A protein has these predicted regions:
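Conserved strand-to-loop "acid loop" that flanks and positions the catalytic carboxylate
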Residues: 307-325
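C-terminal catalytic histidine-bearing segment of alpha/beta-hydrolase fold enzymes
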Residues: 332-379
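Gly/Ala-rich beta-loop-alpha elbow adjacent to hydrolase catalytic centers
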Residues: 224-228, 232
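Short beta-strand element of the alpha/beta-hydrolase
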Residues: 117-120, 128-137
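Mobile cap/lid helix-loop segments that gate and shape the active-site cleft of serine hydrolases
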Residues: 248-302, 323, 327-331, 339-344
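Cap/lid segment of the alpha/beta-hydrolase catalytic domain
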Residues: 135-218, 251-254, 258-260
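N-terminal pre-domain segments of enzymes
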Residues: 20-83
Length: 379
């Protein structure tokens, strides 16, 4: 069994001048940088070659600078990697509860309506409003991690937005529910659209309020495994209302750096060998092979977008395709952002083998419980 945690390979550097109490754990809005000027996006062939992982902290001298840097990273990832996650006005969202536990959210854009429906499973202990863990496609973490905690759970059914699947019949690109609302974004990858969908569920929870939903929207987590681990990471990175993101075995295109997976001698998921329903086709066109070094960002910066909120990455080295050897340096590079602000303990990595894919071993329970208790239950 291979066991590795970020805390064993990185020394946490605390900035004495900046205490954790000064740094928010979560925000009440989806995107704090929504009013910032958009960065210039050069044509791909005009981008410089960068062999090392790009500096996530470029131009950042203080926490106040991070909002702009984070916004720039978000725009790069959308422009070159996954496609646009469009903003939605509050007036375009109408939420209601059906029965005691079903959240229904109607989103109307350009005269078209998309309906999201998810059942909230309330805990048997504690008092409302409850913290909430949302599973992307499902919650693959063991049920016992939530059964004895005052945390509600809910599934984001991504097929309600974009029904692409590697295992079942699905619509083609441009024919998904999302595309009815945004026909100009038919080239989008699924991850931008799925992140959009989860944000609309949070819109609905906020609109109805804790008196109706029994949910504390300042304590929302998101988790998923494999392709849904990537989904959880994109959802958490692109919505600052998510307090805790747990990406389980997300593989290439998730937390694993594209540059590092390109250099791997193993058969791993890299920028040439991923599923391009998830990403912009233009990403493969412009950044395949050694052209990956012209990508102006890498996946450590997707991870860093979660900062200053909490992020836990879980790996499994028994499945080389997951590219954990590329996730480790990516996580180390991302953690430097949290460390820079004296909050390095809000992010961690745990890579442990000896178990099946998406089956969390008991030896990993403590680190998951630590993050759940600290950032959802605030123990």
């Amino acid at each position: 069994m291979k066991k590795l945690t970020l805390s064993t390979i990185l020394a946490l550097t605390t900035l004495m001048a900046l205490g954790q109490s000064d740094i928010p754990r979560v925000y009440e809005v989806e995107n704090t940088g929504s009013q910032l000027a958009l960065p210039v996006m050069p044509e791909p062939d005009q981008l410089p070659v960068i062999h090392e992982l790009p500096d996530a902290l470029e131009g950042v001298n203080s926490f106040a600078d991070w909002q702009k840097r984070r916004s720039d990273i978000a725009h790069m990832i959308q422009h070159y990697g996954i496609g646009e996650k469009p903003a939605v006005e509050p007036s375009q969202v109408k939420a209601r509860m059906e029965g005691d536990s079903a959240l229904v959210v109607d989103v109307t854009v350009n005269g078209e309506t998309l309906t999201l429906r998810s059942v909230i499973n309330y805990p048997k202990s504690g008092q409302p409003p409850y913290a909430l863990m949302i599973g992307t496609s499902m919650i693959s973490l063991p049920k016992q991690l939530f059964e004895n905690r005052p945390i509600a759970t809910m599934t984001f059914h991504e097929s309600q937005v974009n029904d692409y699947s590697q295992w079942r019949p699905h619509h083609d690109r441009g024919e998904h529910n999302f595309d009815r609302l945004y026909p100009n974004l038919v080239e989008n990858g699924a991850y931008s659209e799925w992140a959009w969908g989860l944000s609309r569920l949070i819109d609905g929870l906020q609109q109805l309020g804790p008196e109706v939903t029994k949910i504390d929207t300042r304590h929302i987590g998101v988790t998923g495994c494999s392709y849904a681990g990537k989904m959880a990471l994109y959802c958490g990175a692109f919505d600052e209302r998510v307090a805790l993101t747990i990406a389980q075995e997300p593989g290439g295109g998730g937390a694993a750096a594209w540059r590092k997976s390109h250099e791997s001698k193993e058969n791993v998921e890299n920028i040439d060998k991923t599923d391009y329903h998830w990403f912009l086709e233009s990403q493969r066109e412009h950044f395949k092979g050694d052209s990956v070094y012209q990508l102006p960002y890498d996946q450590h910066e997707l991870c860093a977008m979660v900062c200053p909120r909490a992020l836990l990455l879980l790996g499994n080295p028994d499945y080389p395709w997951l590219a954990d050897d590329a996730m480790q340096p990516s996580a180390e590079a991302a953690n430097k952002v949290w460390e820079h602000f004296g909050i390095g303990d809000r992010m961690d990595l745990s890579i442990i083998g000896g178990h099946m894919h998406c089956q969390l071993p008991e030896v990993q329970f403590p680190i998951v419980e630590k993050f759940i208790d600290r950032f959802l239950s605030e123990k």
